[in-house]
Regions:
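Cleavable N-terminal export/targeting peptides
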Residues: 1-34
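Outer membrane beta-barrel
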Residues: 33-47, 52-191, 198-200, 207-209
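Repeated loop/turn-to-beta-strand initiation elements of outer-membrane beta-barrel proteins
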Residues: 35, 74-77, 112-116, 181-184, ...
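Transmembrane beta-barrel strands of outer-membrane/channel proteins
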Residues: 41-45, 81-83, 119, 186-188, ...
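Gram-negative outer-membrane beta-barrel proteins
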Residues: 45-51, 85-91, 123-127, 192-194, ...
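Structural signature of outer-membrane beta-barrel channels/translocons
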Residues: 66-70, 109-111, 175-178, 207-211, ...
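Detector for outer-membrane/organellar transmembrane beta-barrel domains
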Residues: 199-293
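Outer-membrane beta-barrel "beta-signal"
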Residues: 294, 320-332
Length: 332
């Protein structure tokens, strides 16, 4: 939805002062630009793999501000700001992460595709979701969430000294237009500090979509030399979607650590009900573990749904663990 200043006014009480001031300053250009407020609220009751009973986020909760300005000649300026939070407490999702943790980008979009600058998901994490029954979005049941990219952080230290998984700071992102179903995607980060001898981050993905089929081949390397390679294939016919993926990630060290993950998934749509199941086998330096996930969603509307999720981890060495829960998601 397109928002007026009146709609924004209550929001100013919770947004950082700088962001509110920036939106007010942009008011004179509101007629030429479209600003959209969207997001998702998710909360569930569940028992985790650590056997703790919790009320909290099972999927993700976020508030997003995005917009575009028509510059003429088929060219548009774009921006996106996404804040992630815990719906059960209202707190920022993880201590140490930036306020606009989900994304903070500005860019240009046209016949050439789209280029963005700032913070966003890298090329692998931004495109792998189509090959998991839960879209890599369920901490209980998703084989992707619990296994993919096991040894790979987009940056080992960019999260206030801790590892950053999935997102790049100071990044450049490019998505090509689709030509006969084919598209190319790139992400990279090249900024460094004086005396910093780290390398660059760069990733590339090739995707195809058509005739019910989707396929991807993607890879990325972070500034520490860690690598990830991802391959996925899915087919949708009628109410069924079948999918599979293979992921290989290597942590660069004096003795490298290699994780290999193969996953399979199925999704069946039955009116307002979606049934899901997935399996994954993970091998980390010869230590194997398999994972099984099952779940069901029921959609009350296009925006509101309830779900049930179950996941079980079965390592060859150590104890098995199960997680299960129910939840509700509302998008706007």
């Amino acid at each position: 939805m397109t928002l007026s200043r009146t709609v924004f006014r209550p929001l100013f009480r919770t947004l950082p002062l700088a962001a509110a001031a920036a939106m007010l300053a942009a008011g004179s250009a509101a007629s030429a630009a479209e600003v959209t407020l969207s997001g998702a609220f998710d909360i569930g009751m569940y028992r985790g793999f650590d056997k703790r009973k919790q009320i909290g986020t099972v999927q993700r909760s976020n508030v997003t501000l995005s917009g575009a300005e028509d510059l003429g000649g088929g060219l548009s300026a774009t921006f996106k700001l996404q804040h992630r939070f815990e719906a059960d407490t209202g707190s920022t999702e993880t201590t140490g992460k930036p306020f606009w943790h989900g994304e903070s980008t500005v860019g240009l979009k046209g016949s050439f595709g789209q280029v963005r600058f700032g913070r966003a998901l890298d090329v692998v994490s931004n495109n792998d979701w189509a090959f998991d029954p839960w879209y890599n979005y369920d901490r209980i049941a998703s084989p992707a969430w619990n296994n993919w990219h096991w040894n790979y952080a987009t940056d080992r230290t960019s999260n206030s000294g801790g590892a950053e998984y999935g997102r790049l700071n100071n990044g450049v992102f490019y998505d090509s237009p689709s030509v006969a179903g084919w598209s190319v995607h790139f992400s990279g980060a090249f900024e460094n500090a004086p005396g910093d001898d780290g390398g660059n981050n760069a990733g590339l993905a090739l995707q195809y979509g058509g005739g019910g089929w989707k396929a991807i081949a993607a890879g990325s390397k972070n500034r520490s030399g860690d690598t990830v390679r991802f391959f996925g294939l899915s087919w949708t016919g009628g109410n069924w979607t079948l999918m599979g993926a293979h992921d290989r990630s290597v942590y660069d060290a004096a003795v490298d650590s290699t994780a290999k993950v193969t996953s399979l998934g199925v999704r069946y749509a039955m009116g307002a009900v979606n049934l899901k199941a997935g399996w994954a086998m993970r091998d980390v330096d010869g230590a194997d573990s398999d994972f099984i996930g099952m779940g069901a969603d029921y959609a009350f509307s296009k925006r509101t749904s309830v779900y049930a999720s179950f996941g079980r981890q079965n390592p060859d060495a150590g104890d098995s663990a199960s997680a299960y829960g129910v939840g509700i998601t509302h998008t706007f």
